Design a protein with these regions (language model features):
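Phosphate-group recognition and catalysis centered on beta-loop-alpha active-site segments
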Residues: 1-296
Length: 296
């Protein structure tokens, strides 16, 4: 077998060949280091399911799976009778045109309520119903469950969600977050093996300092908080960043190139296209399948 050492070129110009190889090596290393560190393969996360249905309903969530989402982000709060239901708002005025609060209605009443968005009509699901539907359809897509705390009921909400998840053997398909840091920390204390993040709304100053050392598994931030310095700091602290709500494909690519690990979007089909395109053209090192990561 012919090797470099006995080639004619090397014998005649050893210094030139050595210098050329060194230059190529430096270029390759530079290209590698230029790529931002990404803590796991980038995920497409459908915001409240997707735009293709009434938010947080069966239609929007099942369509998110069909459109290529890795996860559907859903909002979960408690009904009057303590059942986790999937709805974002504290009242029904926007989606059902009713002057009723979620906390004052039973799960049965809520599940019978029609909600509307554009040409779509659907009903409010319970978390239990939704998980059963996903499992029945053998849906690979998981759920990013946001705990919507009302009147300091974070611990009760977390306990109820734990019950539903474990009853349905859905531990490996779900990840969790909340705007309420106390609830995040409580859920961490109860199920430290679960993938639990903090959703930040408003000033990013709230997340500096000791938060990086509190075992947060990921951060979900608004678009305007996804700066180069912030994402780099998060990645250095081994905290993946998911950015919301990004609906423009070119912006999705920009955030992925910045080093974010998840795109939360109303259009999971656009997200799927952007992530697949990004993965074809980039060679990041992925810290994948670390402790606590769900199967995906």
């Amino acid at each position: 077998k012919r090797t470099l050492n006995n080639s004619r070129l090397y014998n005649h110009h050893p210094r030139m060949v050595t210098a050329l190889l060194a230059f190529i090596s430096v270029c390759l290393v530079g290209m590698y280091l230029e790529q931002p560190l990404m803590l796991h393969h980038p995920w497409v996360i459908g915001h409240r399911g997707s735009i293709y249905g009434v938010e947080n309903t069966d239609g929007a969530i099942m369509t998110a799976a069909d459109k290529g989402a890795d996860y559907a982000e859903i909002d979960v709060q408690l009904s009057k009778d303590g059942v986790p239901v999937v709805i974002h708002d504290a009242d029904l005025s926007r989606l059902a045109h009713k002057d009723e609060k979620v906390k004052n209605m039973t799960a049965k009443q809520l599940s019978e309520t029609l909600v509307y968005h554009n040409e779509y009509t659907d009903k409010i699901p319970t978390l239990d119903h939704l998980i059963k539907k996903l499992k029945k359809n053998s849906t690979k897509m998981g759920l990013l469950i946001e705990l919507k705390v009302e009147g300091g009921n974070g611990e009760k909400l977390a306990k109820k969600i734990i019950d539903v998840i474990e009853k349905n053997d859905y531990q490996k398909q779900a990840i969790y977050m909340s705007l309420d840091l106390d609830t995040v920390q409580y859920l961490q204390s109860q199920r430290p093996e679960w993938w639990i993040g903090y959703c930040i709304y408003g000033s990013a100053g709230d997340i500096e300092g000791s938060l990086w050392n509190q075992g947060i598994d990921f951060l979900a931030i608004e678009e305007n908080r996804a700066t180069v310095s912030f994402v780099e700091k998060a990645n250095r602290n081994w905290v993946p960043v998911y950015v919301w709500t990004v609906d423009d494909e070119s912006r999705m690519i920009q955030y992925l190139e910045l080093g974010v690990s998840g795109i939360i979007t109303n259009y999971p089909n656009r997200g799927r296209k952007a992530v697949d395109k990004f993965k074809e053209n980039n060679y990041q090192y992925y810290y994948h399948h670390g402790s606590g990561y769900p199967d995906s």
